[in-house]
Amino acid sequence: MKIRASVRKICENCRLIRRRRRVMVVCSNPKHKQKQG
């Protein structure tokens, strides 16, 4: 899980979602997981 100021999709499998007022990226590749904070 990477915590970044700006999250973005890295590949076509990445999906932007909102959980508990935070923007997150979930993907089939665990390296692409990101959280905004």
Swiss-Prot record:
Species, as recorded: Anthoceros angustus (Hornwort)
Protein name: Large ribosomal subunit protein bL36c
Alphabetized InterPro entries for the sequence: Ribosomal_bL36, Ribosomal_bL36_sp
PROSITE patterns: RIBOSOMAL_L36
Any Gene Ontology CC annotation: chloroplast
PANTHER family reported for this sequence: 50S RIBOSOMAL PROTEIN L36, CHLOROPLASTIC, LARGE RIBOSOMAL SUBUNIT PROTEIN BL36C
GO terms (BP aspect): translation
UniProt similarity note: Belongs to the bacterial ribosomal protein bL36 family.
Keyword Chloroplast: yes
Keyword vocabulary terms for this entry: Chloroplast, Plastid, Ribonucleoprotein, Ribosomal protein
